[in-house]
From Swiss-Prot:
GO-annotated cellular components: cytoplasm
Chemical reaction(s) catalysed: Release of an N-terminal amino acid, Xaa-|-Yaa-, in which Xaa is preferably Leu, but may be other amino acids including Pro although not Arg or Lys, and Yaa may be Pro. Amino acid amides and methyl esters are also readily hydrolyzed, but rates on arylamides are exceedingly low; Release of an N-terminal amino acid, preferentially leucine, but not glutamic or aspartic acids
EC annotation from Swiss-Prot or TrEMBL: 3.4.11.1, 3.4.11.10
Gene Ontology terms describing biological process: proteolysis
The protein's required cofactors: Mn(2+)
A Pfam family matched in the record: Peptidase_M17_N
This protein's name: Probable cytosol aminopeptidase
Protein origin, superkingdom: Bacteria
Cofactor note as given: Binds 2 manganese ions per subunit.
Amino acid sequence: MTDAVKVGFVPLSTAPKGVLVVFTDESMKFGPASRKHLVNAGDVVKRAAAAAEFKGKSGSALDILAPQGVKAARLIVVGTGKAGSVKDEDFIKLGGTATGKIGSNASAVTLVAELPGGAMKPHQAAALAVGARLRGYKFDRYKTKTKDKDKALVAQFSVAVADVAAARKAFIRDAHVANGVVLARELVNEPPNVLYPAEFARRAAQLRKLGVKVEIFDVKAMEKLGMGALLGVSQGSYHPGRMVVMRWNGASNKADKPVAFVGKGVCFDTGGISIKPAGSMEEMKGDMAGAACVVGLMHALAARKAKVNAVGAIGIVENMPDGNAQRPGDIVKTMSGQTIEIINTDAEGRLVLADVLWYVTQKHKPKFIVDLATLTGAILVALGTEYAGLFSNNDQLSERLSKSGDATGERVWRMPLGPEFDKQIDSKFADMKNAAGRWGGSITAAQLLQRFVDNTPWAHLDIAGTAMGAPATDINTSWGSGYGVRLLDHLVAQHYETKR
């Protein structure tokens, strides 16, 4: 991993070093501090903008050698769109856009946190810095030779702000969340020969350093709990499965019910006996992205000392076609006592989640549960790579998730549930089957999960299209996106933290 965007905050008047980044809108005007940094170079910038057809549109940028008199080597002008149109959620994107233009040969960068109408507010400047940090991440641990154009950016970012102390305070909080995103990306990007279940559990256990209580369940412990669904998936692998339960008790009332998050952690998914086609099978190393998000989220909550009690639980397995592997036609008994007929061994994620959801529901009695899983290819057909599928038995929780998705850019789209779909997973031989017909595959998968949450408010996020291999964004060029960490941190911060 290269994650070397170092961020500091300086006064707006500080002389720039290295690369100077300023912001304008479609008026092509600059704020007062930016004008001072540009000295008398305004006309040169306008001519360069005209030649490059740069008009200040959102997401665009002009990159030129710094004109004479400007105390920097390069000048990058980032467009923000129509005057007055920038919203709070846009600042993180602006930081990412700027960083994407800088390249790998800069050692010092000054971002002037100012719009044409005046200085950015502290939380906006902090978001700008977070965007730079997230865009600067690159997973290159296993490269022994790297071309200059592919090298990661290693630079000191000085964010010039009106109120240094306030911006620094806001950034410290947001940086902990960004670190959680980076952790989730790291886990998803790791190759499966490195990140097998025991190693994943070991890395999750490192959250103990932040005050998180971590309990690791091995095969014997899960057998004792009766987790036949999870263990059935795991039984074909050389690497035995694990369940990891992480607890953060940050609420003023330690007895307050926790919020809970559950993640699917299939470290590699061949499909098992119902084996997948060879094409793109290597991407199934990312079938643990839901679990990665939960670990990243628990890191974020603990690091920023969130005033909430939270439980994060992940089921970690490999789905392999060994001689001892689960077969189509098998019937497994879950921790809940309900039985599941195996129709397709490649519908394994719901089996893992079934036992972990039931464990969390019964053991921790949470206020709500949100589970995340790269569960179905069908959700990609339905929603593409821009939205995660949201399924829920609770309108309030669903609405809150939708608003947090809009605020963070990690968007969700609610999908239906209902008895018409639920009956499709009924089995002739067991209480249910793990795969229904061809149509509505994401919905019938969610219907199975709903049978394991009792009456707990619950939401299921199918993140198959958003967590891995999604198109690059302003703040991410990594294969593993870390989707969900910022979304769920926002949900907790807005609605569930203790107010002091």
